[in-house]
Amino acid sequence: MSSKVHLGHTARKRFGQNFLTDDNVINRIVGAIAPDNDHVMVEIGPGLGALTEPVATAIDNLTVVELDRDLVERLQNHPVLKDKLTIHQGDALQFDFSQLVVPGKKLKVFGNLPYNISTPLMFHLFEFAEQIETMHFMLQKEVVLRLSASPGTKAYGRLTVMAQYFCQVVPVLEVPPHSFAPPPKVDSAVVRLLPYAEKPFPCKDVNVLRQLCTTAFNMRRKTLRNNLKQVLSDEEFEQLGIDQNLRPEQISVEQYVAMANMVCDKQA
């Protein structure tokens, strides 16, 4: 049997499917997720149910968002899971997660995410950060390194700044390729994202921060002065106490927020 076939389902490349098969890893992830009935539990991309089964067993109801129609049908006909699941067939990138919120219950979101959509999906989920208690995701190890990076490192970038603006980022465990069927060509890791109840550095307009980061990191090798000359003047950099000769990866989240807030003040 092809390594791409697992439990009778052929992994689809266009959906970035790699199915988790290592019981030890599965148990550790479920332990980190800590399923309970005090939150709305939401899984993105349940696939063949490696995480779905142990999580659903521990709670009354699990909401899942799955794009692949064949996998949705399997879940709908699953002898154990079908009565425990609320299934949304569709693209998580377009999904309105706020519709899942119940009064008095925040979301706990988790998933073994398709690596080809993981970064845009992170940005999409940050829009719902206020409704989310915790997020646990299996990602390409390189993406987890980017999420948790410190200023001055190669991995530090736009994703880092936005993730750390919204959430505390905690790497949980590394997962080797042989834990999946078919094995991916890259190492994987699980990350915990804890959205802040109160952000350490509040921004007046998060869209301005997002745009500023995109502009700053567009040309990583150039200085802030070069990249942001249309946005901030020499005097404004001086006022903020930020060295405009630094490169974008050398600037902290707090400093990016300070720059964005200055841009907001100018637009007011």
Curated annotation (Swiss-Prot):
Family, per entry: Belongs to the class I-like SAM-binding methyltransferase superfamily. rRNA adenine N(6)-methyltransferase family. RsmA subfamily.
InterPro entries named among the record's database cross-references: KsgA/Erm, rRNA_Ade_diMease-like_C, rRNA_Ade_Mease_Trfase_CS, rRNA_Ade_methylase_Trfase_N, rRNA_adenine_dimethylase, SAM-dependent_MTases_sf
Acetylation recorded as keyword: no
Compartment list: Cytoplasm
Protein name per UniProt: Ribosomal RNA small subunit methyltransferase A
The reaction(s) this protein catalyses: adenosine(1518)/adenosine(1519) in 16S rRNA + 4 S-adenosyl-L-methionine = N(6)-dimethyladenosine(1518)/N(6)-dimethyladenosine(1519) in 16S rRNA + 4 S-adenosyl-L-homocysteine + 4 H(+)
The protein's Enzyme Commission number: 2.1.1.182
Biological process (GO), any one: rRNA methylation
Main location group: cytoplasm
Organism: Shewanella oneidensis (strain ATCC 700550 / JCM 31522 / CIP 106686 / LMG 19005 / NCIMB 14063 / MR-1)
Residue numbers binding S-adenosyl-L-methionine: N18, L20, G45, E66, D91, N112
This protein's GO CC annotations: cytosol
Superkingdom of the organism of origin: Bacteria
Key words, A-Z: Cytoplasm, Methyltransferase, RNA-binding, rRNA processing, S-adenosyl-L-methionine, Transferase
Enzyme class: transferase
PANTHER family documented for this protein: DIMETHYLADENOSINE TRANSFERASE (PTHR11727), DIMETHYLADENOSINE TRANSFERASE-RELATED (PTHR11727:SF7)
Example of a GO MF term: rRNA (adenine-N6,N6-)-dimethyltransferase activity
A Pfam family per the record: RrnaAD
Reported function: Specifically dimethylates two adjacent adenosines (A1518 and A1519) in the loop of a conserved hairpin near the 3'-end of 16S rRNA in the 30S particle. May play a critical role in biogenesis of 30S subunits.
